[in-house]
Amino acid sequence: YDSRTKEFLTKLPAAPTYFHKPITALNSHNGDVVRPKRCKWLNYEGEIVIIIGKTCKDVSIEEAGEYIAGYSVGNDFGLHDFRDTDAGSMLRVKGADSLAPVGPGIVTDWDFRNKMIRTYVNGELKQEDNTDNMEWNMHYLVADIARTITLVPGDMIFSGTPAHSRP
């Protein structure tokens, strides 16, 4: 999101960055997020999750929507204590057990354009933005990843977060 780029006072990189979340990070909508011992900085990031519906490899941005089964909401929690330790890989930061709650459902035939995304923490609004302010839209993300990685049904892509995610 443009708001996140501005928040960190950085220039937009030439391409999005991605990281892997192991299946053990996946959690249900009302599942318990487990803060590991010695974790001081547990960060929230409300995101729209793209769910792949059929095998996808080397597709164009224009074709990408044909491979999306639907969308859900997710919280991309992160253990920011490990941010420097992992030197950019984000595996421990984002991949720890239970840190990726998704759901409660999937919407299909949904146009992601011009939609509001909001993150609440204990009932208080913390993040708010419009999907039209994404630096790279949902179809771009699918096509970009599928240039080098085969996506299969059930794969999920967390699409990025607006400004104001904090531990």
Model segments located where?
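Extended, compositionally biased flexible segments
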Residues: 1-44
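Catalytic-pocket segment enriched in acidic/His residues
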Residues: 4, 80-167
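A generic local secondary-structure boundary/capping motif
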Residues: 6-9, 33-42, 56-63, 90-94, ...
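A short secondary-structure junction signal
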Residues: 7, 29-32, 37, 59-64, ...
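Short, conserved beta-strand element in jelly-roll/cupin
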Residues: 19, 49-54, 102, 150
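Hydrophobic, aromatic-enriched interface-forming segments
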Residues: 46-49, 57-58, 80
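Residues embedded in well-ordered beta-strands
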Residues: 47-51, 72, 118
